[in-house]
Swiss-Prot record:
Span of domain Helicase C-terminal: 373-533
Name of the protein described by the UniProt record: ATP-dependent RNA helicase DED1
SUPFAM superfamilies, sorted: P-loop containing nucleoside triphosphate hydrolases
Modification sites for Dimethylated arginine: R62
Domain commentary: The Q motif is unique to and characteristic of the DEAD box family of RNA helicases and controls ATP binding and hydrolysis.
Covalent link location (Glycyl lysine isopeptide (Lys-Gly) (interchain with G-Cter in ubiquitin)): K158
Residue ranges annotated as motif Q motif: 142-170
Localization annotation: Cytoplasm
PROSITE patterns: DEAD_ATP_HELICASE (PS00039), HELICASE_ATP_BIND_1 (PS51192), HELICASE_CTER (PS51194), Q_MOTIF (PS51195)
Residues that coordinate or bind ATP: A186, Q187, T188, G189, S190, G191, K192, T193
Length: 604
């Protein structure tokens, strides 16, 4: 990665920062050799998927090992996760035998790059500051052990090649084990998914399912009674969480399902009718299934809101409140509620009062900021020179995957077609592509069949794609928080990454925030950005939550917020964070409206 950063530095794209970008044909030197792929076929799809054409990536239905199953009833004191899962018999967890083929499908092999678990800088997380506030904060764990974790979960964690807990996992495991609610802010890429899956599954493996009410109708009218419900703002993130859940529920009695809009509801209904113990869902589709009477929340022990600030920013608050407050959800105090996100400004914390009880507030790392594992470069490039500058960047990069962000769906298609014509293996993901096309594009990118992914905001938030070594902001966003989330797609789980941004006079609204981000992360600030900042109007960075300042990760109860007072322990080592941002919308499957989001409709 250091070599790639040096190559970018030596590209002569900014020989003189004040003069801006110098096109290759004016530099007095030949164009760099480009990455060729003679096996690429641009007919009927290829790596780009043809925007509706054929593709060699099959659209397999989600599910995989352990999701076949029968309807999970409470028959004779036993519970089974289908033919391939474990069983809960007379108060005891009986794991299924190990299956070599299933383990390869779920966990890969050690040298498989698609199953990246940790990077060369993972030990650096030991030095990340942590602030845990609330009553009687449990001591954090320092390693994966039993107790407090269940033995079967430990085996699955070992299969996934996780060797040590991240800071958020060190705290979340004992917090959940002690029956407490949790609001957690953690640096992007720092293991938030494991932060809620590990403790929730561990406790579920120990305590088993709740008894289900007797069926009120025929088999096809039965409801699913999940023990855990995880809500996420987008179908891509929901699918990603589900894929992780399949790994860690391996051989257990817990059957995981995922539901989201944009895909036929029939397949999802059939999976749910076979039994569902852990449900991952987007708010719109979950509301739809509740209205259809296919799901009951009466047995929910664990409610998880992932990217909670984003869901509220996207206008999902009415849906979430309906799910939590108006349906048959287990009430506050009788369930455990966990809220996870990269940012939690004060207004979201105030809303959390309605969903959490006696919770512990956890801030890990420089939340809402950029990882120091990411080397950031800002280049001055006029719009007409961007394609040429991009080719130079790509020619300097030979290893890993590159994620390129643009602002519009039209530009995503145009740039992808341009890159394909230059013999790069590129694909695109944006809102006009169908769900199956998006899944095929992501599968191609994850596997390395396509080394370039051109994306609108779809891939900007929450997705964990291994081996992304370079993020290029071809078009800078208007909000600095979106910039942070975009570049957070690299440098994840302790790995190093490079982020390059094309900047010009049209990006004046992000000048101050970008300067602040670079300075905060000890990155080089180019002179043209300093000059632009001096001339930019106003004094506050453009952030949709800028009104709450830079310290929005703080527990508002410490600052005299509602319910403040009487809060004892605090393991504080740092404070200084930023707010979130929002865009997108959920599925059209529900009658619930969308009130938030940005002008970019790329989610759909």
């Amino acid at each position: 990665m250091a070599e790639l950063s040096e190559q970018v530095q030596n590209l002569s794209i900014n020989d003189n920062n004040e003069n801006g970008y110098v096109p290759p044909h004016l530099r007095g030197k030949p164009r760099s050799a480009r990455n060729n792929s003679s096996n690429y076929n641009n007919n009927n799809g290829g790596y780009n998927g043809g925007r509706g054409g054929g593709s060699f990536f099959s659209n397999n239905r989600r599910g995989g090992y352990g999701n076949g199953g029968f309807f999970g009833g409470n028959n004779g004191g036993s519970r089974s996760n289908g033919r391939s899962g474990g069983r809960w018999i007379d108060g005891k967890h009986v794991p299924a035998p190990r299956n070599e083929k299933a383990e390869i499908a779920l966990f890969g092999v050690p040298e498989d790059p698609n199953f990246q678990s940790s990077g060369i800088n993972f030990d650096n997380y030991d030095d990340i500051p942590v602030d845990a506030s609330g009553k009687d904060v449990p001591e954090p764990i320092t390693e994966f052990t039993s107790p407090p974790l269940d033995g079967l979960l430990l085996e699955n964690i070992k299969l996934a090649r996780f060797t040590k807990p991240t800071p958020v996992q060190k705290y979340s495991v004992p917090i959940v084990a002690n029956g407490r609610d949790l609001m957690a802010c953690a640096q992007t890429g720092s293991g938030k998914t494991g932060g809620f899956l590990f403790p929730v599954l561990s406790e579920s493996f120990k305590t088993g399912p709740s008894p289900q009410p007797e069926s009120q109708g025929s088999f096809y009218q039965r409801k699913a009674y999940p023990t855990a419900v995880i809500m996420a703002p987008t179908r891509e993130l929901a699918t990603q969480i589900f894929d992780e859940a399949k790994k860690f529920t391996y051989r257990s009695w817990v059957k995981a399902c995922v539901v989201y809009g944009g895909s036929p509801i029939g397949n999802q209904l059939r999976e749910i009718e076979r039994g569902c113990d852990l449900l991952v869902a987007t708010p719109g589709r979950l509301n739809d299934l509740l209205e259809r009477g296919k799901i009951s929340l009466a047995n929910v022990k664990y409610l998880v809101l992932d990217e909670a600030d984003r869901m509220l920013d996207m206008g999902f608050e009415p849906q979430i409140r309906h799910i939590v407050e108006d349906c048959d959800m287990t009430p506050v105090g009788e369930r455990q509620t966990l809220m996870f996100s990269a940012t939690f400004p004060a207004d979201i914390q105030h809303l959390a009062r309605d969903f959490l009880s006696d919770y512990i507030f956890l801030s890990v790392g420089r939340v809402g900021s950029t990882s120091e594992n990411i080397t950031q470069k800002v280049l001055y490039v006029e719009n007409q020179d961007k394609k040429s500058a991009l080719l130079d960047l790509l020619s300097a990069s030979t290893d890993g995957l590159t994620l390129i962000f643009v602002e519009t769906k039209r530009m995503a298609d145009q740039l992808t077609d341009f890159l394909i014509m230059q013999n790069f293996r590129a694909t695109a993901i944006h809102g006009d592509r169908t769900q199956s096309e998006r899944e095929r594009a992501l599968a191609a990118f994850r596997s390395g069949a396509a080394t370039l992914l051109v994306a609108t905001a779809v891939a900007a938030r929450g997705l964990d794609i291994p081996n992304v070594t370079h993020v290029i902001n071809y078009d800078l966003p208007s909000d600095v928080d979106d910039y942070v989330h975009r570049i957070g797609r690299t440098g994840r789980a302790g790995n190093t990454g490079l982020a390059t941004a094309f900047f010009n006079s049209e990006n004046s609204n992000i000048v101050k925030g970008l300067h602040e981000i670079l300075t905060e992360a000890n990155q080089e600030v180019p002179s043209f950005l300093k000059d632009a900042m001096m001339s930019a109007p106003g004094s506050r960075s453009n952030s949709r939550r800028g009104g709450f300042g830079r310290n929005n990760n703080r527990d508002y109860r410490k600052a005299g917020g509602a319910s403040a007072g009487g809060w004892g322990s605090s393991r504080s080592r740092d404070n200084s964070f930023r707010g979130g941002s929002g865009w997108g919308s959920d599925s059209k499957s529900s009658g619930w409206g969308n009130s938030g989001g940005s002008n970019n409709s790329s989610w759909w």
